Amino acid sequence: MSRSLTGALAHGFLGQSPLWYKAVICLFLVLNPLLLATIGPAAAGWALVIEFIFTLGMALKCYPLMPGGLLLIEALLLQMTTPQALYEELQHNFPVILLLMFMVAGIHFMKELLLFLFSRILLGVRSKAMLSLLFCVLSAFLSAFLDALTVTAVIISAAVGFYAVYHRVASGANPREDSALDSDQQVAQLHRDDLNQFRAFLRSLLMHGAVGTALGGVCTLVGEPQNLLIGHEMGWHFADFLLKVAPVSIPVLGAGLLTCVLLEKLRLFGYGTLMPETVRQVLAAYAAEDDAARTQAQRIALWVQGLAALILIICLGLHVAEVGLIGLMVIVLITAFTGITDEHRLGRAFQDAMPFTSLLVVFFAVVAVIHQQQLFSPLISWVLTLPAEQQPGMLYLANGLLSAISDNVFVATIYITEVKQAFLNGSMSREHFETLAVAINTGTNLPSVATPNGQAAFLFLLTSAIAPLIRLSYGRMVWMALPYTVVMGGLGWWAVTYWL
């Protein structure tokens, strides 16, 4: 009986995660008290930071909230920080929590409009280079005002929908009836080459779209959660943030869009595959049937969502309220005028954001430990001993390398908090502080496209339903992101070092 209970407990601990991963987390939990008792709080604090970064890097094995949360509960019990310090950290960053709670949910109710736009572009543009550029531009524009995860989710939804239609037709099934999309056994030999080509076509479009969210997300206060966090620390509103980061973000945006076109024209790194004509004919016929069947209520819903999007952009530009409250307004407007009054339908809009919001609380708990143990103070002090003109570039590199393997919100939180403390201590001027803030913001946003771990949108794409269908693996994502990483990361460093 005891063996079965032990086995059940071991199986339930962290669920379907590999046994080696469970063993590593248990080792961390045993190691931390020993380090605290033998070497001291600084060593235990650094161990905690490294362990938490490990959980972020292994996000595909287990969502970091559970293992990271266990580590932080232990840190609280070991008094490496206090519940009061965590509460004050959350209170200080409350606008970011509001953003994730309400803005992401608000954009959820615009999905039909966004899906309509991406579908029209996909079928209306025949040039692959122009189509890729439009996907990248639209993703960048939407991510500058909306939420990158939601924009990525919409692109994925469009891709899954189109893939499902053609896969069913190629399998001899009704395109409007459910079928197994993960098996090619029923696909006629005649259609197999076209299906594989269509997969490569969708892979390239999805990667362009995901990179577009990073290109646009770095530009504005609401583009990424860490932007709002940094803007809040600096006292910047929407227009302030846009102008401060423009010397870096605008050149990088232009270079990223140029890279998109060149990759398609030169057919490098897995890009350049065209949509087979047979696939286009099937999808166009399906879309025409959908248009004919669209009801008046559905058309009105699209207009309401479009008007709400316009109001959202105006309110953000004028900073009429905190970003999260504007998101709540969008929820009220769209649901009130489209007849969404059921509590369960409302609740689904919050499902995507709440896990990450909970994880963000764990981020801030780690930051509270870092503050209490002063872990990053020596590093920041060393950077500040460098000549002033070298400091932005060095911070950019430090942020970029860590953001590529960890979560950029976590990295940005650590660095902006430590640099602000140095500013408050009189170690730099306000102008130099703003320069370093831009370096931290761009350093966490641009080089982090190198791996799926760095960008939430990339990780979301990798773990989505479409990834196995179109054969998009971790390694393939890294390979396809490589040219963007070099261009965006390299030009970003140059701009931070020489143009700020």
UniProtKB/Swiss-Prot annotation:
Subcellular localization is given as: Cell inner membrane
Listed GO CC annotations: plasma membrane
Query: Function of this protein?
Result: Na(+)/H(+) antiporter that extrudes sodium in exchange for external protons.
Domain of life of the source:
Bacteria
The name on file for this protein is Na(+)/H(+) antiporter NhaB
Mind telling me which InterPro entries this protein's record contains?
Na+/H+_antiporter_NhaB
Taxonomic lineage from the root:
Bacteria, Pseudomonadati, Pseudomonadota, Gammaproteobacteria, Pseudomonadales
What Pfam families would the database entry show? Answer: NhaB (PF06450)
Family membership: Belongs to the NhaB Na(+)/H(+) (TC 2.A.34) antiporter family.
